[in-house]
Amino acid sequence: MRIIGIDPGLARVGYGIIEIKNDKKILLDCGVIETGKEKKEEDRLYEIFKDLNELISHWKPNLAAVEKFFFYRSSTTISVVQARGVIMMVLASKKINISEYSPAQIKLTIAGSGKASKKEVLDAVMYNLELNKPPKPDDSADALAIALTKLNEEGFN
């Protein structure tokens, strides 16, 4: 089984891909899809669409976990929601089962507290995946935490 965890954004979409093999969690890939601020918004959304399609075609995940978006008073709210829509559309078009989790759910599942710090979540990601150094950038570590939340729900803790 392979899962892709996704931390949505317009400037940066974090992703993490984990495989379960012989009851062991194996990190296959993680990183970010970055879109340049100098580009028009529609071009940035298309870049997310294109790059996410390529990732999925390459890694062929069976499951997807996406962080739920909470509305904040911000000038980027609509852009992030649009990027999330593109992400959900790509996953649905590939017939990948999608689960969504709030930040508090992810923190609770991964670090044991819905109010866990970034460092506590990062430490839990490193522990769960037996990593010697933290995944970079932070958006990819967040995406791995999202994927691990789904795996925990599936019984792989």
Curated annotation (Swiss-Prot):
Annotated residues for binding of Mg(2+) 2: E67
Record PROSITE patterns: RUVC (PS01321)
GO biological process terms, semicolon-separated: DNA recombination; DNA repair
Cofactor: record remark: Binds 2 Mg(2+) ion per subunit.
One Pfam family cited in the UniProt record for this chain: RuvC
Coiled coil: none
InterPro entries recorded: RNaseH-like_sf, RNaseH_sf, X-over_junc_endoDNase_Mg_BS, X-over_junc_endoDNase_RuvC
Cofactor: Mg(2+)
Enzyme class: hydrolase
Catalytic activity as recorded in UniProt: Endonucleolytic cleavage at a junction such as a reciprocal single-stranded crossover between two homologous DNA duplexes (Holliday junction)
SUPFAM superfamilies the record matches: Ribonuclease H-like
Keyword terms of this UniProt record: Cytoplasm, DNA damage, DNA recombination, DNA repair, DNA-binding, Endonuclease, Hydrolase, Magnesium, Metal-binding, Nuclease
Compartments reported by the entry: Cytoplasm
Gene3D superfamilies linked: Ribonuclease H-like superfamily/Ribonuclease H (3.30.420.10)
Domain of life per record: Bacteria
EC number: 3.1.21.10
Function: The RuvA-RuvB-RuvC complex processes Holliday junction (HJ) DNA during genetic recombination and DNA repair. Endonuclease that resolves HJ intermediates. Cleaves cruciform DNA by making single-stranded nicks across the HJ at symmetrical positions within the homologous arms, yielding a 5'-phosphate and a 3'-hydroxyl group; requires a central core of homology in the junction. The consensus cleavage sequence is 5'-(A/T)TT(C/G)-3'. Cleavage occurs on the 3'-side of the TT dinucleotide at the point of strand exchange.
Quaternary context: Homodimer which binds Holliday junction (HJ) DNA. The HJ becomes 2-fold symmetrical on binding to RuvC with unstacked arms; it has a different conformation from HJ DNA in complex with RuvA. In the full resolvosome a probable DNA-RuvA(4)-RuvB(12)-RuvC(2) complex forms which resolves the HJ.
PANTHER family membership: CROSSOVER JUNCTION ENDODEOXYRIBONUCLEASE RUVC
NCBIfam families: PRK00039.2-1 (NF000711), ruvC (TIGR00228)
Name by which UniProt lists this protein: Crossover junction endodeoxyribonuclease RuvC
Organism: Prochlorococcus marinus (strain MIT 9312)
Phylogenetic placement of the source organism: Bacteria, Bacillati, Cyanobacteriota, Cyanophyceae, Synechococcales
